[in-house]
Swiss-Prot record:
The keyword Ribonucleoprotein does not apply. This is 5'-nucleotidase SurE. It comes from the Bacteria. It comes from Pseudomonas putida (strain ATCC 47054 / DSM 6125 / CFBP 8728 / NCIMB 11950 / KT2440). One of its GO terms (molecular function) is 5'-nucleotidase activity. Binds 1 divalent metal cation per subunit. Belongs to the SurE nucleotidase family. One of its GO terms (cellular component) is cytoplasm. It holds the Pfam family SurE. Its EC number is 3.1.3.5. Its cofactor is a divalent metal cation. It catalyses: a ribonucleoside 5'-phosphate + H2O = a ribonucleoside + phosphate.
Amino acid sequence: MRILISNDDGVTAPGIAALHAALADYAECAVIAPDQDKSGASSSLTLDRPLHPQTLANGFISLNGTPTDCVHLGLNGLLPQMPDMVVSGINLGANLGDDVLYSGTVAAALEGRFLGGTSLAFSLLSRQPDNLPTAAYIARRLVEAQSRLVLPPRTVLNVNIPNLPLEHIRGIQLTRLGHRARAAAPTKVVNPRGKEGYWIAVAGDAEDGGPGTDFHAVMQGYVSITPLQLDRTFNDAFEQLDGWLEGLL
């Protein structure tokens, strides 16, 4: 088994070190990750400049690009052998509901969709690393179990782990994505020279976070697993759109 590990927190982040340590004796693991924090990069590719991989002392490969760049290069010649699966994380911070649209953690897993195995993205609901051992243990268990899993092609599992010691985790729930309320307005700032700028505000609170959602599961102490697919076609809208288009051209 060969696993490509990436993230969006950066190659020196504690989460990717914990994930690699958890998987290193299970599979042949290669780490390719951004050289700096690329949270919120989504599935962006770097197309305006060359990418320069650099192998660090610990064997991890640092790249001056996005999480998707990292996986794309890993699957297209940077590694001597093609990985069997992609595992992303462990992100310090939730990737729930609408977060998946912006998440570089989820995007890295999505870039592995062409492989035969199911890719996984792991996130811990904390900005602090205290419970990374919990997340790393759960990641190891799920990666081991993935070999017995048969899902449709191009499926990614988005895994969110409560910020709890392992003994307080109540179990695992399969969930759908919830939805967040609209984020607050960006914060306007002015630097000492009078130049204006803006900080993007934090994500909105859960607006659709009832039973069955990823929000609800983690708030109740359960690990949330949400299967994701790339196809965002809204099939239920076809009937209304057919009528709307009639006679336009």
